[in-house]
């Protein structure tokens, strides 16, 4: 699997504390290997789709931080990363 990091994801990531950045990198490694890795707790966000109509997923970085993404074939499109409240604006 490969990743496409949107500009919004890159900005969100840049603003994270260093310890959360490290955990996020680990979470992305887990995602690359296995969408169902237990620490990610990945799930589709009910009623959320990206502009192309793909389901939006959320996964866990830490207790307080999440990231959102869509799946397009063999590619993960990373939309947002940050505190739990990013779920209000996942794309």
Please report, for each region that a protein language model flagged, where it lies by residue.
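A short, surface-exposed loop/turn module that caps and links secondary-structure elements
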Residues: 30-60
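N-terminal first-folded block
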Residues: 5-41
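Short, mixed-charge, low-aromatic patches
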Residues: 1-3, 45
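Enriched for short, Lys/Arg-rich terminal
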Residues: 2, 10-18, 22, 51-54, ...
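Flexible domain-boundary/linker segments
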Residues: 26, 41, 45-48, 76, ...
């Amino acid at each position: 699997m490969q990743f496409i990091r949107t500009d919004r994801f890159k900005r969100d990531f840049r603003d994270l504390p260093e310890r959360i950045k490290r955990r996020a990198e680990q979470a992305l490694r887990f995602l690359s290997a296995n969408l169902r890795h237990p620490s990610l707790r990945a799930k589709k966000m009910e009623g959320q789709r990206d502009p192309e109509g793909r389901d939006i997923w959320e996964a866990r970085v830490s207790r307080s931080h999440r990231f959102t993404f869509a799946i397009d074939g063999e590619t993960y499109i990373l939309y947002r990363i940050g505190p739990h409240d990013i779920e209000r604006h996942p794309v």
